């Protein structure tokens, strides 16, 4: 059931196998994004992870917005069998992750090295192009200066004779310096590439093992114990050196009762960490997922009437820039935080901020194309009348055919459903591995052991929630996804306005 491997030495140009970790419930968004952004194939999933094949380089991989972390896949297989009481036998099972198929490890390391070298070359070429442009500008300035002096010679030939000679000498010196500098940079560029190759030589690698263990194996061993066993096996088999503080390579291993996955983190920083967000509000992956559902088109009027720190608008404006965005809130502190985020992201001229109440929007009826908002959670926010008043005002300003995407708490969502058994969790009949929107991809009892490609399971779960939702006035539910916010769960719900509300 292990992942099929390419020939050893095959690079990313032949398509490499990756996987992303995702917040619970966001797997369908990651799957859509890798297909659309990376032209990914062989897209599969298990709870919390999405696997795919792509030829994309690091620059494109960095652009993923819905995923948490990205890994180059080494191995994916059934869980380890922990039936023996002998720790030695269990440790041998762990070591088989390395010893049983060393080719998959060497192939992954080769692809990882090629990705880094290709990225380094592109970075160097970009810097060299910038330097060449600067040199060209400098040469043009010298030529312009020389022409100006020649014009002055016609009027004051005697006085400027010496100056012309001096400028000619400066020009020759500058050209000589430019030639030497360019030659030096080319040599430096070549040295850096050779150094990169030496640094990533497979025999001289330094590494660290990071483990996550849950289920039966998590009860029997700590992550540190497993990491030590795996680390020793790697050192013996490949001759690499352990370095816990500053390794060249990190090995990630996740072991549980459902699967065993081994990979290499492609980036040290999480994809969900946005450099352009100064103060985080709603998690960026959730905000991007909401915006991706809204069908944003160039020229649209997009409103977030409860914008908080503006995370949803920031994510939307970065991805779909040619749009008129408006953020509103009643809190001065929230709006100040949003403004700081806009300045940090360079989006001050893209998003307009208003201090207004969501139930008294100073906008004409049917004037807004899209509304995206995180409905506030917590004890201070009353259910019932308040949530309905908010939806009524959103319905009023939204034009017919427009879209609303909301993040609703479980209580808010329950209030808007016709589910009579509201005290029963929506996924109560599912096992702990069958999250809403997720169908089991790995069934240990199946002889084939194949990870299934997702096609209809997400849609089936989506319909499961939609069946419990009824239209609110002219707002018709279209999609609904249950997602994790960490300590609590919420629902991303999409509505379409079917007809004039008459308000």
From Swiss-Prot:
One Gene Ontology cellular component: nucleus
Annotated InterPro entries: RlmKL-like_Mtase (IPR000241), SAM-dependent_MTases_sf (IPR029063), THUMP_dom (IPR004114)
Parts of the chain that traverse the membrane: none
Tissue and organ distribution: Expressed in a variety of tissues including brain, colon, gingiva, heart, kidney, liver, lung, placenta, small intestine, spleen and thymus.
PROSITE patterns listed in its UniProt record: THUMP
Main location: nucleus
Entry annotated with the keyword Transferase: yes
Single Gene Ontology MF annotation: U6 snRNA (guanine-N(2))-methyltransferase activity
Pfam family, one: UPF0020
Protein location: Nucleus
Similarity comment: family membership: Belongs to the methyltransferase superfamily.
Function recorded in the entry: Catalytic subunit of the THUMPD2-TRM112 methyltransferase complex, that specifically mediates the S-adenosyl-L-methionine-dependent N(2)-methylation of guanosine nucleotides, most probably at position 72 (m2G72), in the U6snRNA of the major spliceosome. This modification in the U6 snRNA affects the constitutive splicing efficiency of introns that have suboptimal splice sites and can impact final mRNA levels.
Subunit: Part of the heterodimeric THUMPD2-TRM112 methyltransferase complex; this complex forms an active tRNA methyltransferase, where TRMT112 acts as an activator of the catalytic subunit THUMPD2.
Name assigned to this protein: U6 snRNA (guanine-N(2))-methyltransferase THUMPD2
Provenance organism: Homo sapiens (Human)
């Amino acid at each position: 059931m292990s992942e099929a491997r390419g020939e050893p030495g095959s690079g990313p140009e032949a398509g490499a196998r990756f996987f992303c970790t995702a917040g619970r419930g966001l797997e369908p968004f990651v799957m859509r994004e890798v297909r659309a952004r990376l032209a990914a194939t062989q897209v599969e999933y298990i709870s919390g992870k999405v696997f795919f094949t792509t030829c994309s380089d690091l620059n494109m991989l960095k652009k993923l917005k819905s995923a948490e972390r990205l890994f180059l896949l080494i191995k994916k297989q059934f869980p380890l069998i922990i039936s023996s009481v002998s720790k030695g036998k269990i440790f041998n099972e762990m070591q088989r992750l390395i010893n049983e198929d060393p080719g998959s490890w060497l192939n992954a390391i080769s692809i990882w090295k090629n990705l880094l070298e290709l990225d380094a070359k592109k970075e160097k070429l970009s810097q060299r192009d910038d330097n060449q442009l600067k040199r060209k500008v400098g040469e043009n300035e010298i030529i312009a200066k020389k022409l100006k002096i020649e014009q002055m010679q016609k009027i004051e030939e005697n006085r400027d004779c010496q100056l012309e000679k001096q400028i000619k000498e400066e020009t020759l010196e500058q050209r000589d310096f430019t030639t030497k500098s360019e030659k030096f940079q080319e040599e430096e560029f070549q040295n850096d590439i050779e150094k990169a190759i030496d640094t990533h030589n497979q025999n001289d690698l330094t590494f660290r093992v990071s483990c996550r263990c849950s289920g039966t194996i998590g009860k029997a061993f700590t992550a540190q114990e497993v990491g030590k066993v795996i680390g020793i096996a790697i050192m013996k088999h490949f001759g690499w050196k352990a370095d816990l503080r500053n390794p060249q390579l990190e090995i990630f291993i996740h072991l549980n009762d459902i699967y065993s996955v081994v990979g290499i983190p492609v980036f040290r920083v999480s994809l969900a960490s946005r450099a352009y967000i100064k103060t985080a509000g709603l998690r960026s992956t959730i905000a991007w997922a909401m915006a991706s559902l809204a069908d944003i088109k160039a020229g649209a009027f997009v409103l977030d009437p409860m914008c908080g720190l503006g995370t949803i608008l920031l994510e939307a404006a970065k991805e779909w820039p040619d749009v008129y965005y408006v953020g509103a809130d009643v809190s001065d502190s929230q709006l100040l935080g949003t403004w700081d985020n806009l300045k940090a992201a360079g989006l001050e001229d893209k998003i307009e901020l208003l201090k207004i109440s969501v139930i008294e929007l100073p906008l004409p009826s049917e004037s807004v194309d899209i509304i995206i908002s995180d409905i506030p959670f917590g004890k201070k926010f009353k259910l019932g009348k308040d949530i309905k008043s908010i939806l009524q005002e959103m319905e009023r300003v939204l034009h017919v055919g427009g879209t609303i995407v909301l993040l609703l708490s479980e209580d808010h969502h329950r209030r808007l459903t016709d589910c009579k058994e509201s005290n029963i969790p929506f996924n109560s009949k599912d096992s702990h591995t069958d999250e809403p929107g997720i169908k089991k991809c790995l069934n240990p009892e199946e002889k084939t052991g194949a990870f299934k490609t997702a096609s209809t399971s997400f849609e089936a779960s989506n319909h499961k929630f939609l069946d419990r939702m009824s239209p609110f006035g002219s707002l018709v539910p279209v999609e609904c996804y249950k997602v994790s916010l960490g300590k609590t769960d919420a629902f991303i719900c999409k509505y379409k306005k079917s007809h004039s509300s008459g308000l």
